[in-house]
Every structure is written in C-alpha cells, then in structure tokens.
Amino acid sequence: MSDDGALLVLEDITVTFDGFKALNSLSLTLEPGELRAVIGPNGAGKTTMMDVITGKTKPDTGVLIFDTLHDLTRLDEPAIARLGIGRKFQRPTVFEPLSVRENLLLSLAGNRNPAFTLWAREKPSERERIDELLTTIRLTDDRHRRAGDLSHGQKQWLEIGMLLAQEPQLLLVDEPVAGMSDAETEQTAELLRDINRTRSLVVVEHDMAFVRALGVKVTVLHEGSVLAEGSIDEIQDDPRVIEVYLGR
C-alpha cells in the first residue's frame, strides 16, 4: 500500500450478500484531520461502507487500515470503538428521561457505571469537559433540559456530543440533517466544521445544499464502488454522476 500517513485506508473492499455485491472493490483514503462527504443513490453502498469500518460487517476481501497500524478486519466492534472510531446513526439515540448534562456525563470517556455516575459529585475535569461539549454542540442554555424535550435537530447535536465525549479520532456521521429545519441544517454544517478542527469526519448525506455548505471533498459511491471524487462543483458537473442521479 502507498497511503503512508493516511488515517483510514480502504483498498479493494468487497462485501457480498447472497450473491449481491454491496461493496465492489471499494477503495478510499482519508487523511488525518480531513472532513469528507460521501454521497450516492440508495443502494450505492454507503451504509455497508460504514458497517465495514466499524466492524459490524466483515469484508470478503480487501485491506482496511486505521491510523497506519491497525487492521480493522481483525477487530470486533468494541475494539474498533476503543481505537477511536465513533459512529452516529441517522436516528438520534439519547437517554430521553435524563438531562442534556446527564447524557454527556454518562458518555465521558472512562466513566463509571451509570448509577454511580449520576449520583456521584462531578469532578472539576468532568465539569470542564461537559462545558466544552455543551459549547461545541450549541446546547449550553439547555444543559438542564430533559433530552426528550429537545427538538429533533438538538437531539442530533446531543448525540454528536455524546460521541465526542468518548474522544474519537474519527467520527462517522450518517445523514445528520435529515428532518432538520433550515436553521438547524445551517448550524449543523457549522458544528461539523468546528468539530473538524480537532477530529476527522466522514459525513454521509443526501442533502446536496448541506454538502455544498460543508465545502469539502466529496466521494460519490455507485454500485459499491467510487464513481467520482472532487469538489461539489466538479461532482455536480460530472457526466457520470449526472447519469446516475438523473438517469440521462
């Protein structure tokens, strides 16, 4: 392999389900500190790609290396999470009866069992980290609010904050703005750019206006392979992409 120094390398990854190739010799490289957008029609392989990276699905063939040293194909999901890969699914999963602050406290890296954590006195370092996370996810004024009372967009931000509390190197985010208002969508683009100052991210999204707002390199998947890569303008002008999306 020739991707020395890359944070994540997928090389010729193939995944087959009952004879159907969900991923077909997929190759992709993510550099340290990069924010990458991944788009593609339904069935293009986006979810399967994230399943492979996180260990949920094992590839039939191919190379998958994280942080230049770790062969992810040999590790299970918990081990991959401990290495520093976090995943945000499309639907938010927060502890709705608890407050925003309590959700973040439970998620802090290295924290204790839930019952002890909620009743124990916060350490100064924990309080400081929670304050930082609240600022990042735009929920400082909602710290004592019940998570179940947040808007859909705010729940998405809270779950992103819960993942950040685990101190991942790489964050995989699946359709973060689905169901959001225009204002929340705009703030989410800002949020992900802020996170990208200290973390690498892969964002899977269908909303092209949101992808444009991110202003980053875009990878287009089609039939389990990379169809095109480039800026959003280059992607939208690519005849192959136009044919896949518009059928002409």
Named regions from a protein language model:
Residues 2-248:
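Glycine-rich phosphate-binding loops of nucleotide-dependent enzymes
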